[in-house]
Structures are given as structure tokens and as C-alpha cells.
Amino acid sequence: EDIQTPHLDAMAKASLRFERFYAAAPVCSPTRGSCITGRHPFRYGIYFANTGHMKPEELTLAELLKRHGYTTGHFGKWHLGTLTKTDKDANRGGPQGKEHFSPPQANGFDVCFSTESKVPTWNPMDKPKVDARRTWWDISDDTEPYGTAYWDEKGRRVTKNLAGANSRIIL
């Protein structure tokens, strides 16, 4: 049985529908940049995964939508620049990553709940403790901190209400 979505169906009928999408690059960062700019990676300067940052002069889809009254948000892996100038986050954040500071809020997004990189498909605050002899990881195994954090649109590290019955995050 199909799920009935009359509001989405009406919106799609009155809109431009894209039925095909081609990635701009074989890796994530340049493709993400192309999705939010509509431009080829060599035009905005991010050529490889987890390198570079969105330049301030680059116009994004979020900025265009804001001009037309939309509220914009980014949720999940950003991978288009660092999210903090102070804390060491993932593999590029912190004082060493200042030159690549380019969070979603500097690129037209009103709200965000984002990580600099590496959003796993399990608890995003944990990573498995593994050794080279193992070929899998069970979610019940021991974990350690993942090394990346969630950040909000004000540049604050999100630490509360991320998991369990008291979670206050709804997407």
C-alpha cells in the first residue's frame, strides 16, 4: 500500500521536479558543494573530500531561498569547511583549521545541527573500538568518543539531549 502524501504531491505538481541527478565528483565534499551552489567543483574550489572550504563570495541555494522568504537549515555532515575555530573537532577543526572556517550559518543557513565530518549510521557520538584483525563491529561492542561533535547555528557545541528517552532532537 502506498503512503498518501497529498501536500507533498500538490507541492510537486506546482514545482519543478528533478528526476535525475548526477554527482559532480566521485567523493562527498565537492559533490556537496555542487549541490548547494549549482556549480562545478573547479568553479568554487573544493576538489577532494574534506579539503578546502566554501568561499564567502560563493552564492548558495540557501542564500537564494532566504531572499525569497524561506527559512533554511542544514542537518548532518557538513564537510564544506570547519565548524569551530576553538575546539579540536574531527580532523580539521580548532585553531589549526581557522583558515577553513566556513560553517553552514556563514553560507545562508538559518539553523543547523551539523558535524564537520563522519556521520556514522549508529550513535554518532560513538565509534567502535576495533583492531586490524576484526572485520565487523557489533553495536553492542565497546565504543569510544568519535572525535567529532554536533554544532548549532550559533557555533555552540551540542552536548545535551542527544540520545535515549530524553532526546530533544526531532528531524
Which residues does each PLM region occupy?
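Formylglycine-dependent sulfatase
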Residues: 1-171
